[in-house]
Amino acid sequence: MGPLSILTIIFIAVVIDLLFGELPTNIHPVVFIGRIIEIFKKLKERYSLINTRIAGAFLTIFLIILLSWIFAFIIWIFKFNNLLMIIISSILLSTTFSIKLLINSADNVKIDINHDIDNARKSVSYLVSRDTSQLSYEKIISAVIETLTENITDSVVSPIFYTFILGVLGGIAYRVVNTLDAMIGYKNPKNINIGW
């Protein structure tokens, strides 16, 4: 695909995400990735330190290859018609974005914070991993801004960048690595020995 096709796919994918948001969880590729990572996390307890490190590296490579192969196959099926291929590629790429979800989540906090701070705390808890039960008005606003700033990079700018540079499969590979980072990339006691 040429640069114009890639730009068209990116544009359509963003529009799809803005209009429709996330796919249902039972068919969402990121949820599929997450399930495989969860299975790995349960199995890793059986491995020695070196095997856990090797398995973590293998998991990364395996997921990138698996998802890239699945998406490439789906795109290839529609290669006979360029317009269909662009539409299907756009739908697949839209799964790497979370623009509408981010906007809606921030809007929910904005609405809640003006009416009920406890509801605002609960709404912001869906955006951050920290304890939100005692956050003040200012801390809630700060948490939303921090989350939006980080997630604009993770869920908008980076998928677009990698897709533009490496094509649709580059955007997909980015989302795999980003999901791995979010789920097992933190150097806490549970994840310290996964990969290097």
Model-derived features: positions:
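Hydrophobic alpha-helical transmembrane segments
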Residues: 1-173, 177, 185-196
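Glycine-rich phosphate/dinucleotide-binding loop and adjoining beta-alpha-beta core of small-molecule
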Residues: 182
